[in-house]
Amino acid sequence: MVFPSQEEQIEKFEKDHVAQHYFEVLRTLISKKSVFAQQVGLKEVARYLGEIFKRVGAEVEIDESYTAPFVMAHFKSSRPNAKTIIFYNHYDTVPADGDQVWTEDPFTLSVRDGIMYGRGVDDDKGHITARLSALRKYMQDHDDLPVNISFIMEGAEESASMDLDKYLEKHADKLRGADLLVWEQGTKNALEQLEISGGNKGIVTFDAKVKSADVDIHSSYGGVIESAPWYLLQALTSLRAADGRILVEGLYDDVQEPNERELALVETYAQRNPGEISQIYGLELPLLQEERAAFLKRFFFEPALNIEGIQSGYQGQGVKTILPAEASAKLEVRLVPGLEPHDVLDKIRKQLDKNGFDKVELYYTLGEMSYRSDMSAPAILNVIELAKKFYPQGVSVLPTTAGTGPMHTVFDALEVPMVAFGLGNANSRDHGGDENVRIADYYTHIELVEELIRSYE
């Protein structure tokens, strides 16, 4: 099979008037800042998307009764008993903070050397326009769709999709029974293989706080008075072994072990090994798991307790000889199937009490359950086979990713097979400076989604 080069894909993209039209829509979307964490631009972007979909004949519903509006767009086939594909996407992005390095304005879509840059170009606005481009390209040559297509677009994905469960419960009757749900995004790995995955880890995040005194105390008392930071550090250390295993009683009892197929998929396709990880990130500390099989099992199928940040005492210039009265930390546990956020936090609370650290106060912030698809579902196998036609380096099929998203929420409401694949690359820098997508990959995603629609003829 002969595959087009990146240059040929760019040339096709530049000559494709449908792709060019929605590239301009993407340019507008990038320019419209929509950050849930800052409550900026959410209604404006939701309404703009609603108009874009209405113009091409979709039945559009915009629900502004939530903190971030939901946009649903339906394209109906006239065929009796037509199946349904759902595309789940989000229009919110993370901020483009001042500490991120951007070569150009993050809210101006720019193109350099065949690569497009901008906040949300991969996560996730570019996926919306690429998938709509695919649908419109199919409709150029056909009077009807062979399959019903629905888009669900939310504006709070980057903040744990806080209302998604309630929204889907309200609309479940019109969405249940779909043949397939295509997840918000995906990427190619470092070997240029398209990663096709069917799940993600969950998460529970929480704050830990300690107050040891009414005021900071002179550090000359350090030999006889316990300080908040020492107390907190000892408490946190008691929760994790040196090899990274979580030391919380009962936590692993409910973990759903991977089956043989899931282990085999990871062993065959996962392009993450200890040596590469160390090199990519310039690690100065040893890995918690050096042996590849144990590394992969830990990465994909086991929970992880992480410290996101610690704060206490004086951090200014020079010295300040004190015993800080307060200390706090932001923590998270990455969850796997079988673990529920509130239950995990309850177990941590009990373990801290048992370990003698009852003065540590815990505050739940957010949580999401984890999910793994059945990667042998016929609709998912169809995607895998179709993708092989478009990616010269092949595909990498993974039962789950180590990241987090609301897959469990969607499955719980709709009970539909879900698969993730997209237009990103191994260096797309989502959430960082110079977020980017190669134009060739963007256009290949359009072609694959169009072929997916055609496969239902």
State what each model feature region is.
Residues 2-99, 326, 343:
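N-terminal helical capping/dimerization or prosegment-like subdomains
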Residues 80, 191, 247-326, 334-347, ...:
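An extended, acidic, His-containing surface patch that forms the Zn2+-binding/catalytic region
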Residues 82-153, 444:
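Active-site metal-coordination/substrate-binding segment of hydrolases
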Residues 91-93, 115, 152-160, 184-189, ...:
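Acidic, glycine-rich active-site loops and adjacent beta-strand->loop/helix elements
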Residues 92, 239, 243, 349-358:
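A common structural junction motif
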Residues 124-199:
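Acidic/histidine-rich catalytic neighborhood of metal-dependent amide-processing enzymes
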Residues 166, 222-243:
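A short core secondary-structure module
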Residues 195-211, 421:
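Flexible glycine/proline-rich, aromatic-decorated loop/lid segments
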